[in-house]
Regions:
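Beta-strand-turn-beta hairpins that frame and shape the catalytic cleft
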Residues: 1-3, 115-136, 189-194, 228-230
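N-terminal active-site segment of His-dependent metallophosphoesterases
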Residues: 1-56
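Active-site neighborhood of phospho(di)ester-bond hydrolases with catalytic His/Asp-centered motifs
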Residues: 6-7, 31-36, 57-62, 138, ...
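Short active-site segment of divalent metal-dependent hydrolases/proteases
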Residues: 11, 38-39, 64, 142, ...
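Metal-dependent catalytic neighborhoods of phosphoester/phosphodiester hydrolases
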Residues: 15, 37-54, 67-79, 181-184, ...
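Active-site neighborhood of divalent metal-dependent phosphoester bond hydrolases
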Residues: 47, 54-116, 121-124, 132, ...
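Anionic-ligand binding region
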Residues: 152-186, 190-198
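Acidic, His/Gly-rich catalytic cores of divalent-metal-dependent hydrolytic chemistry
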Residues: 182-265
Length: 265
């Protein structure tokens, strides 16, 4: 089974359109969005409309959670006073632009989606002989919508998160930096866990300004005892970055956000 997953669009319509066109071309079996549809760019309503039009299963990001409740707190972790000041402008701007219908939609979004694959070893006794391979979709982490799971997270800490979530694969976003880590654990037999950060469609921070999403392939032979039960492809998609950057500069959003798009920082 091939699944397309993307996250952190952040109101960047040109980036989303490019990603969706690429997904359409590849024709996966399923598509999921892991949140943060709004914030930092000028097209929050248009992004929400596109996701709704396609009926893409979507979870709430921290920014969606805040805007859905007309809050002036996006649950973001800003490092400097300048970032905090810019962040206040962004959430005020987004609250002003998002319509009532779009805001109501954001409030309906769940905080996680679990997809269980029941892998039958004996077709005549499906339930009694089935192994479950579990995929958990979250925005930040299974514990908090705005928890950052960076690539250098301590392995023991990350394993605890997997064990508490009872998941074989956890896909998430929030950091805007893509990676795939394979961890091993389990008492009786080795069990492999996959941590997959999807990166960002509309606001990458890994030095590559192209939009990013993931194609996740789960073969029929998938099981927790194999490190090859999940194939992860990070797909980078060109889009008109300059159009998005100039749109920011022509709005009351901070110009720093335009440079962030150009430099992916």
């Amino acid at each position: 089974m091939k699944i397309a997953l993307f996250s952190d669009i952040h109101a960047n319509l040109p980036a989303l359109e490019a990603v969706l066109a690429d997904i359409d071309r590849r024709q996966p079996d399923a598509t999921y969005c892991l949140g943060d549809l709004v914030g930092y760019n000028i097209w929050p309503n248009e992004v929400i409309a596109e996701i709704r039009k396609r009926n893409i299963p979507t979870i709430a990001g921290n920014y969606d959670f805040g805007i859905g409740r007309s809050s002036d707190d996006c649950g973001c972790a800003y490092k400097t006073d300048e970032e905090k000041a810019n962040g206040k402008v962004s959430i005020s701007y987004t609250n002003d632009r998002v319509g009532d219908e779009e805001r109501a939609y954001l409030r309906t979004l769940p905080v996680h989606i679990r997809v269980d694959f029941h892998l039958a070893n004996d077709p005549e006794h499906l339930w009694s002989s089935t192994e479950t391979f579990s995929l958990l979709l979250v925005h930040g982490s299974p514990r908090r919508i705005n928890e950052y799971l960076f690539e250098d997270r301590d392995e023991k800490s990350l394993l605890r998160i997997f064990e508490q979530a009872n998941a074989d694969v956890i896909c998430f976003g929030h950091t805007h930096k893509p990676y795939h880590r394979i961890l091993t654990g389990g008492d009786e037999a080795t069990r492999f866990y996959h941590a997959v950060n999807l990166g960002s469609v509309g606001k990458p921070k890994d030095g590559d300004p192209r939009a990013c999403y993931v194609l996740l392939t789960i073969p029929e032979s998938a099981h927790a005892g194999s490190s090859e039960s999940v194939e992860v492809e990070f797909v980078r998609v060109e889009y008109d970055v300059e159009k998005a950057a100039q749109a920011v500069e022509n709005s009351r959003l901070p110009n720093d956000y335009a440079e962030s798009l150009r430099k992916a920082r």
